Amino acid sequence: MACRIAKLPPGRSSGIELWSESIAIFSLARRQGAAVGSLRMEARELVDSLPPHLAERCRWMESPRGPGDLMRSGIVVYWSHHALRTAENPALDTARWIAATRNVPLLVYQGLSERYHDASDRHHRFLLEGAADLQRQCRDLGLAYRFHLERPGHRQQVLVEMMRNASVLVTDDFPLAPTRSWVERLRRLTSLPILLVDASCVLPMTRVTKAYTRAFAYRDAFWKEYQRRIPMPWPSLDLPAAIHPENLPIEEIEVDSAKFSQWIAECEIDHSVGPVLETRGGSGAAEERWESFLRAGIDQYAARRNDCAVAGVSRMSPYLHYGMIAPMRMARDADARGAEKYLEELLIWRELAYAFCYHTEEVDDLSAIPEWARKTLMEHQRDARESIHAWESLARGGSGDRLWDLAQCSLLRHGELHNNLRMTWGKAMLQWTRSPEEALRMMVDLNHRYALDGRDPASYGGILWCLGQFDRPFEPPQPILGTVRPRPTDEHARRVDLKRLERHVKRPAGARRWRVAVVGAGLAGLHAARILSDHGHEVELFDKGRGPGGRVATRRIEEALQFDHGAQYFTIRDRRLVRLLQSWHQMGVVAPWEGKIVSIQTDGTVTPTEPMQRWVAVPRMSQLGRHLAEGLQLHAQTPISQVVAQDDMQSMLIDGKGDRHGPFDAVLLNLPPRQIGPLLKQPCQWLGMLEQTQLLPCLAAMVAFAEPFETGWDGAFVQEHPVRWVARDSSKVGRPKKLDCWVLHADANWSIDHLEEDPDQSARQLLRYWNDRLGGGVPEPIFVQGHRWRYSIPSPSLDCQSLWDPARGWGACGDWCASGRMEGALLSGMALAGRVLNHLHDPSLRPTPPPQQALLPLQ
């Protein structure tokens, strides 16, 4: 079958002469992959048969099971993850060439996992938009394409299944986690040959035989080669039509933007990081942004690139990270414009970082920075810090430093950070964390979590530069920094028009600022409200109670009498909430409850429960709700009686006094399911689902003894008894110790039977039951009071984390949507906030007014 380089118009060089000079692919040093001697002859012959411009970018990964059988007639699978394009894609071209020369089917496969670090709505939406473009482009080329989105019911190992019927796997060579570990896992799972192809760099990483630590040294070594490569057009392949594979383990699905919001909601990812409206994914969006920059920005790039308050940079890094545009094409275009400084950044600084990561195993560790930098930072590790900030404070832009907080706001709301500002942003971490290691972890976390170009070698280049990488010592030593180059925020702020920068970065995430009402200030409602507020939207909370928190409540009678009569403690198992928990602990909002927890059997036998980390808020459980409500507008003691939809697709709230509030673009209800229906004066999509769940009641008793009641334990689950739970409240961190305070919770069935009785009488009855179960010995209390929780225990919880009607703009959340615990409430609120933020990103669901002036590029 004939395969050749397509002929080019007269006067244009294909660059084959240049590529031929570089084909000594197997003589290059390998940090990973199989040695030449262990590869079978067919593997060497396969790469040797490739055109030189492709062969130089290839390297093999050999399985521990052996080099595999390249001669079998299985399909060629191209797994695309960091080259989401068909134009000038060396990895795709390699796969197409191999399939055509061997006359076997070719499949382009793209998967999107829930399990990569920092997986969020933001990254998922960007990648889904990229997948839609890639699917269209593959169809235009007549290539078979399959997409797999990991989510409940769709968590099979599709790629592993496809590899069983393949002869070779071709994939993008990307030098960082999680791709590196995924490829390694595939290498160990199968004997299938894996061919890695560099599609990210103009100068292939395989051509750089070591990690360079200074940009000038890298430039001196490779600039002449870059000068030869830059103007060369990418050779096009003249190949026969691709053969489509049959009997694949995955059906073809349409990657349709109308499905994205629902797909994303189903994924177990971080829904607190919303999509970025002004930066859509895909080759089409990349092309549009690049062409706009060529028309109106590149000529002024050198003069304006360092001013973070003006539109002076290309903002192409997210598209380069995921390979939605070819760096070869960008280099040619920039060279044609004579944009030397842009080429310096695109080629020298960016590809220096790629080569560094290619040759460095642990880029998340201080071992990645130069020895002099490690030494000086460790020497100054104990220097006094002005203040130590928890992750939550920094993530929300709450350092108190105006410039730094604006930088973080840009990351949080818009998924990007101006490169020059990133340098100052990163160095500030050293003075707000307890060690250089913690500063590095904080930089990596915040950058990768929020930035669309996070987890990229260029990102690591910028982050590690803040700690001395690619730099030299600066004398004299400074506190905390030592001889690492200083970059004070106050000095940088004097060079910036802060008012202009603030107007730009504080615009909301979305086409306009939405007004959102949250009815019910329980944990789910508070978490949703805070996420939406952090993304720049106007949120108002309404609650019939005196304060926030819902059932995460504390009754304070007097200084010595305090009872957590609602939620007793909480656990956090979900990885999406771990960072919040760690921050709350560091800030003193929560602390571990080290009390001994047991189970009391029907015969009175006491057995210890399985060990687990239980947490309580400090100095009382209600403090967690107050913490989440900080900075939010809360209308306490304002019960809402009606939610009324208007003709303009907005809604009004009417409270118990008849006062009207609104209009609101969205109304989120954090209420018991049976209370929601009567509020809604028009139907909505999910109203019928509320009949599938209910909140059962719970009667609580608050009891105090003058002296400690010694039981040998601090909390107990009581089996098959009217009292299902009892706890020594005084054993929790930060509680008053003058009196011995206890809380008893009744069984749901007993609570139903006695719900309308006097709560204080019920409390005394529960105390008698408890005394009977213990066989007597409970002392005479000095205080007994009851409380009726009419809505407490979900039975059952819905099999979804939130409810959302995009046509109405109405949503509902609560622990009854998830696990029935505090953790479930937090996840439910996060999920509903994600639905709203994705809705703002999806113009097909509701009409969106024209963008505000603040959304226009800065002039």
Give the residues covered by each predicted segment.
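Beta-rich, aromatic/charged-enriched effector core domains that present basic-aromatic interfaces
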Residues: 33-37, 144, 149-271, 275, ...
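Glycine/tryptophan-enriched, flexible segments
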Residues: 35, 71, 211-369, 500-503
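Active-site-proximal binding-pocket segments
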Residues: 307-496
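Conserved flavin/dinucleotide-binding core of flavoenzymes
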Residues: 470-477, 492-495, 547, 555, ...
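N-terminal Rossmann-like FAD-binding beta1-loop-alpha1 element of flavoenzymes
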Residues: 514-541
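Glycine-rich FAD pyrophosphate-binding loop
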Residues: 533-556
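Central helical "cap/lid" subdomain
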Residues: 549, 555, 563, 664-714, ...
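A conserved short coil-to-beta-strand element within the FAD-binding core of flavoproteins
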Residues: 636-650
